[in-house]
Amino acid sequence: MKNKEIIINNYLNLENNYIKLPKKLFSEQNPSEVPSTNLVVFNESLASDLGLSEEFLQSDDGINFLSGNKILEDTIPIAQAYAGHQFGHFTMLGDGRAILLGELKSQNGERFDIQLKGSGRTPYSRGGDGKATLGAMLREYIISEGMHGLGIPTTRSLAVVSTGEDVIREEILKGAVLTRIAKSHIRVGTFQFISNYGTIEELKALADYTLNRHLKKAEYEGNPYIYLLNEVIKSQAKLISKWQLVGFVHGVMNTDNVTISGETIDYGPCAFMDVYDPDTVFSSIDINGRYAYGNQPKIGVWNLARFAETLLPLLDEDLESAVEIAQNSISKYSDLYNKYWYTGMRAKLGIFNEKEEDKELIQSLLTMMKRFKADYTNTFSNLTLGNLSDIDMFASKEFKMWYEVWKERLKSQNQSSEESKMLMEKSNPTIIPRNNRVEEALVAAIKDSDYSVMQSLLDVLKNPYDYSSINEYYSIVPKSTSCTYKTYCGT
């Protein structure tokens, strides 16, 4: 491994416990050096939350650290190995352009990974150059921070540094490195890798590390690996329900993009739905709609079944019994997902308690929204405001009948209309990272080096549930529909 310039580490207390795992799970790898560095965007609030020195990170040494030009003393950067099912096909993968610099403990004792994306080739790069484009890294920064503002578990973005490099794709583009923060980068694909290429002892070592890092041992009795499986199923059911509730389409739900921590990861071909349509697909390579908006819950359980398969040797010594345990756990996913999603949809309609007829109320509204091509976000925010003039569907006889049924449902509960409105305000964002506004910010940044448009967008995305000062510019529905917007796996 090539020697790197060292920064005397008086600012960040990084560890790397991952290297205590079997060595086939990673490769020691320094980031590549870049010709020039410019700190394009820096997340001061995240740095503060993590207890990081903002002064150091914005200094010359700090920017060199964030670009990969320098590493901290006594740290061992690594690239992680993993496998995965990509569009249903199993393949060997790994960090092809990402380097894990280390782990830090936040002020409340929680452990986080610090990873550089676009930091050069690794042993897992296959034919790639290991680099990333400025546009793709800024896009991940915007959308991941938007997801955080929406209250959805996600990896975070600490900084983007432009590198002065030309990155060759279909055209020559500006290069950049993004600093990603995650509770960990352990994926379903990590378990698939060790299950296929390691021993049972190595699988157990990974599972034990995961339990120690993400779950409290005191919380379970009996077989800890059954507990691990059940907790991952629960966290993924909850995560995907949150995606559905805000109209988020991930676009590349391969098993290597399913985190054990329950965080959203990989913002390549993702986007937010404008017009409500379960068949919405944005990814240019998802030609069969495998990862369409309406398919995401089903893909979630498919991915979790792949995770359960990796744990079979740890669930029970008898294979038949292990399979039965796994199937029993997986069978709980549907009820868990429906519980989280219906609870969320009731909240979007100001409903506190549960009644069976709520399902029909919710589904009939969604059916109307699809037929009238209603904007998903604005339908619910306008219902929250009581504004029934801005959406064509609201003038229909069918909607007026639905509206009366909904109002009667609200009257049937103990909470007041004001309490229902407050619940709706907490559940229905007025602002999402709309595709047209994200693109507008990226064009200004990349073509004109004007980052003010992006900063304005980031500012409003911090408070998407603020009904006291709605910024209409960011809530206007674009004239073109969701179907015309295409995304690419740039990140």
UniProtKB/Swiss-Prot annotation:
One of its GO terms (molecular function) is AMPylase activity. Its EC number is 2.7.7.-, 2.7.7.108. It comes from the Bacteria. Mg(2+) binds at N257, D266. Keywords: ATP-binding, Magnesium, Manganese, Metal-binding, Nucleotide-binding, Nucleotidyltransferase, Transferase. It catalyses: L-seryl-[protein] + ATP = 3-O-(5'-adenylyl)-L-seryl-[protein] + diphosphate; L-threonyl-[protein] + ATP = 3-O-(5'-adenylyl)-L-threonyl-[protein] + diphosphate; L-tyrosyl-[protein] + ATP = O-(5'-adenylyl)-L-tyrosyl-[protein] + diphosphate; L-histidyl-[protein] + UTP = N(tele)-(5'-uridylyl)-L-histidyl-[protein] + diphosphate. The active site is at D256. InterPro entries: SelO (IPR003846). It holds the Pfam family SelO. Its cofactor is Mg(2+); Mn(2+). ATP binds at G94, G96, R97, K117, D129, G130, R180, R187, D266. Belongs to the SELO family. Nucleotidyltransferase involved in the post-translational modification of proteins. It can catalyze the addition of adenosine monophosphate (AMP) or uridine monophosphate (UMP) to a protein, resulting in modifications known as AMPylation and UMPylation. NCBIfam families: PRK00029.1. This is Protein nucleotidyltransferase YdiU.
